[in-house]
């Protein structure tokens, strides 16, 4: 009973650590910006100084910098936690066993699933925002703050496509899912990690599609027996959303809307089919 309770609270601990680390890095960053602004400030009123400081700590560059630093630190810390306490080092499946089973099929499956889910998530957000219109401005403000609605800078791409997915996979599909899996059936553990993954984004509209995507990631991590497939899928999904610009939006009329929606459903289905086929060949 004690071991069960220990695993239950441990499955929530990574999310708490992520939140605390984000806050800590933000405050440290704000402190350094304040010191820099105070050191370089020469003239003007206090309100001018405060306005300049406020503009700096709410800027896209500051937000992206904080996310990049926290994700890099969390990825290193959680890697050692996962490797030392959770990872099954005696597992027969290698880190990229699912990919090696049939590389071409796996790569095509990842690409199809990434593109398909990007479109589906976009349409899902549009539908949800019709029922909850107040959620859309919150989401747009969040995306503006993270620089995802403007030009794609190198730090932003590095965080969104590389460091962020590694950090989040170690946190949710690595630690959270693994601890939950010790005391719960797969479906329950998958729902728990997906809910925490959605909650981490702290935006109701984004939480809707990140929950759905989290379920898919958890499913393939379970299939692969390790984090490699989750990381690959997460990187690919984010890369499509960030690097393709407006590609994941679509539909100027009902017919085009339907065709793109249907095509995204087919792409998602084929992607899942190909990756499942690879998993069976690996077994």
Task: Cite the ranges covered by each PLM segment.
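N-terminal, membrane-interfacial amphipathic/helix-forming hydrophobic leader that caps
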Residues: 1-107, 115, 239-283
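Membrane-interface helix/loop boundary segments of multi-pass membrane proteins
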Residues: 167-192, 219-226
């Amino acid at each position: 009973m004690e071991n069960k309770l220990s695993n239950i609270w441990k499955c929530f601990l990574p999310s708490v650590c992520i939140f605390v680390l984000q806050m800590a890095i933000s405050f440290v960053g704000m402190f350094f910006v304040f010191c820099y602004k105070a050191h370089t400030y020469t003239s003007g009123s206090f309100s001018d100084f405060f306005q300049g400081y406020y503009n700096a700590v709410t800027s896209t560059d500051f937000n992206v910098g904080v996310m990049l630093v926290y994700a890099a630190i969390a990825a290193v810390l959680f890697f050692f936690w996962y490797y030392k306490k959770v990872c099954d080092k005696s597992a027969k499946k290698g880190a990229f066993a699912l990919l090696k089973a049939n590389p071409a099929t796996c790569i095509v499956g990842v690409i199809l699933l990434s593109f398909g889910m990007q479109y589906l998530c976009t349409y899902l957000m549009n539908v949800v925002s019709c029922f909850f219109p107040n959620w859309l401005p919150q989401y747009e403000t969040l995306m503006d703050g993270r620089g995802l609605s403007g030009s794609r800078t190198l730090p932003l791409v590095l965080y969104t496509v590389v460091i962020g997915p590694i950090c989040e996979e170690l946190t949710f599909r690595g630690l959270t899912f693994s601890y939950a899996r010790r005391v719960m059936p797969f479906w329950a553990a998958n729902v728990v990690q997906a809910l925490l993954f959605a909650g981490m984004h702290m935006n109701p509209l984004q939480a809707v599609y990140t929950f759905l995507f989290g379920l898919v990631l958890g499913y393939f991590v379970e299939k692969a027996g390790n984090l490699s497939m989750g990381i690959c899928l997460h990187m690919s999904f984010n890369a499509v959303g960030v690097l393709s610009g407006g590609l994941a939006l679509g539909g100027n009329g009902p017919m085009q809307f339907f065709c793109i929606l249907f095509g995204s459903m087919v792409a998602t289905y084929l992607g899942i089919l190909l990756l499942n086929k690879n998993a069976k060949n690996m077994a």
